[in-house]
């Protein structure tokens, strides 16, 4: 599925997202994350060995809500499936790219310290095939009518 250009522009301008992964039949886990895309796949970068990495391996379906960086009432809900998990050094490079984009410096360290010197746990990238995009556009706030 093709991602809307407005969504790609929001991501390029440092939109944040909330991801939801399924823990079990009764529980869902949510996280606020940085987000990226490649072509028409959503990319999520996370530390290997986290609870959410276990969740996604048990149930690869995922929901991602991406908030417009200048208007939190404009957002996109992405429903999709994690189709590929990248676990090589490119995932570490990718988190540095995201950290530079979002915060102006490499991930969790100064520019003169390498990934290996910092002793960080390796990263992984989830490549999400998008099945559905629901756009929610900001509109003037009004009182809700009683149901």
Residue ranges of model-derived segments:
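A short beta-turn/loop motif at secondary-structure boundaries
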Residues: 25-27, 70-72, 116-120
